[in-house]
């Protein structure tokens, strides 16, 4: 299955091309995911609002793709603990869209316009917002997931959909057979027409050209608007339906409609295509650690396909205290990302992501870790393989990630791989008791 080359598909920074077809398109972004496997990071925020790479949120990648693809009519469907996401959209994204030119990014919580239920599935979420789509009178509706990391030109997919005369087009990604069990798996003919679709099969069928590779659905769809409305309205009347695009809408459409697969066109400009579902703590951690490498797989430095976000009005990061004689008091960070407003004040940072406003105090060590905004690490503390949420205060002389049994006893989240996670609002008692000695029983309380 080979991607078709279309005019403008590889043009640098497609913003401003103003393809008339994109003006006939409304984009619906599903951003209400609970992200339960990312707990406790999603205890107070939806999965798309989880920070990534220090300066971004997960949602910024799909929104940047939209803007770079000249898609400027966006409906963002939220549901679960959306306040953090709502605030981020307001401060980071509103100014990119001009209402006077018919552009918008609207955050749409469940309206209960049709019945008293919350969203019951991906298809039901769109069904409950047919009114919001219909009033814009689009010819095409693009449906995206708001919780994946990748760089893609959606304009190419819409043009492909139009040329094929498709009713629906599904974004397709080549994955290993082992990975394919977590996806919807497709079979296509020589014209990229879907002939079979299985949702998360136990024994996925490989592609015809490679017995070790499967064609997986990316959860990205282009629909003809009228066709979409008809299928959603019919699905809503089916009591045994899961009201899900992968389980119900797409398999049903294959039987009697023009359904095509569009091969993922990567804008990452690296040797290997990049697409990640950071739905587990380990996957999330590895995606961040990739970014601090010498040559990251995810390219954040490509000015032709920028990833945008909110940039706070803070001073640049600062590193203070150099070695004085034999003292180990030296503010430094190597193989790391350090964001605005952070101060490395005599501490040492290695292979870590340091968020805005963090402070690493004298003689502290942070290794292989992710610190969200405004984390304060006390003197002589040591942190290894940890994810620390926003605003957490680490007392002096505290060790995190060195004694996993102690970390569990404190009430911290410790994964099977030994990754330690401290949630926002949790406090760590000082390891130094009132008489100045180390207290091994100090614990964490909310």
Curated annotation (Swiss-Prot):
GO BP of this protein: glycogen biosynthetic process
Binding locations of alpha-D-glucose 1-phosphate: 119, 184, 199-200, 217
Enzyme Commission number: 2.7.7.27
Family: Belongs to the bacterial/plant glucose-1-phosphate adenylyltransferase family.
Oligomer and partners: Homotetramer.
A GO molecular-function annotation: glucose-1-phosphate adenylyltransferase activity
Organism: Rhodopirellula baltica (strain DSM 10527 / NCIMB 13988 / SH1)
Lineage: Bacteria, Pseudomonadati, Planctomycetota, Planctomycetia, Pirellulales
HAMAP family xref list: GlgC
Protein purpose: Involved in the biosynthesis of ADP-glucose, a building block required for the elongation reactions to produce glycogen. Catalyzes the reaction between ATP and alpha-D-glucose 1-phosphate (G1P) to produce pyrophosphate and ADP-Glc.
Keyword Cell division: no
Name listed for the protein in its UniProt record: Glucose-1-phosphate adenylyltransferase
